[in-house]
Amino acid sequence: MADLQLTDETPAVADDGVWLACIECGETFAPFAEIRYTCDDCDGLLEARYGDLPTFEDFEGEGVWRYNAALPFEVGVTLPEGHTPLHRVPRLEDEVGVDALRIKHEGMNPTGSFKDRGMTVGVRVAQEVGVDRLACASTGNTSAALAAYGARADLETLVLLPAGKVAAGKVAQA
């Protein structure tokens, strides 16, 4: 496996300080030059790498896009997502023996799922690489998120659901 520790060297393929690196052989690729899922050389998985990693001081604002310093774009296809509340759970704090436990209520996202957090970035990446149609096969939250974010991006979206295998609430959600 390749040594992927941070280095001072940013490869020539880097786009705005970001590149893809194979976790097996270390080969590097431009992040948006073409649609690529695995390494051309060894078929290994690719990892996003940064010349300079952002720090917490680089993050401001709310929602998913407050982390845009660590994302490939300033803003995505947004509904907006990620403005979900944290709830105190004093009884659970006592039970597990911690002083300040919070539970994030991801059901408050636009489609009722944490999947919105990834889909806002994913649909934006699809736009960047020139995709004009989106599709997924899912029985739940992914289908709802793709339907919503695909519609927001005005992209043709196809969601495949197995016959008789999806709860009515999930179909309505999508």
Model regions and ranges:
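PLP-dependent amino-acid enzyme catalytic core
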Residues: 2-174
